[in-house]
Amino acid sequence: MSRSVKKGPFVDPKLLKKIIEMNKKNEKKVIKTWSRDSTIVPEMVGHTIAVHDGRKHVPVYITEAMVGHKLGEFAPTRTFRGHAGSEKTTKVK
């Protein structure tokens, strides 16, 4: 179920405050955040946000196409290493 329209999108207040201050100063620095559930708003476009994936911060450059999505969508938490090989390939003849 999606969030109610009357509530508006969730954005971590500290993260939004940092973005707004950087927009006023016209500077572009990488911002570290653990808030994967924050929604990307138009003020964030053009910034690089380092989103925590559980062990490190993944730098994510925000574009206009990302507006409305969550930050966590762009920092995968699991690594897929592939399925086990078939016996034919592992068996020595």
From Swiss-Prot:
Question: One GO cellular component from the entry?
Answer: cytoplasm
Q: Which InterPro entries match?
A: Ribosomal_uS19, Ribosomal_uS19_bac-type, Ribosomal_uS19_CS, Ribosomal_uS19_SF
List, in alphabetical order, the GO biological process terms annotated in this UniProt record: ribosomal small subunit assembly; translation
User: Is Ribonucleoprotein among this UniProt entry's keywords?
Assistant: yes
Per its UniProt entry, which superkingdom is the organism in? Bacteria
The entry lists its GO molecular-function terms as: rRNA binding; structural constituent of ribosome
Which key words tag this protein in UniProt?
Answer: Ribonucleoprotein, Ribosomal protein, RNA-binding, rRNA-binding
The Swiss-Prot or TrEMBL record describes its family as follows: Belongs to the universal ribosomal protein uS19 family.
Function (record text): Protein S19 forms a complex with S13 that binds strongly to the 16S ribosomal RNA.
Its recorded name reads Small ribosomal subunit protein uS19
| Source organism of this protein record | Caldanaerobacter subterraneus subsp. tengcongensis (strain DSM 15242 / JCM 11007 / NBRC 100824 / MB4) (Thermoanaerobacter tengcongensis)
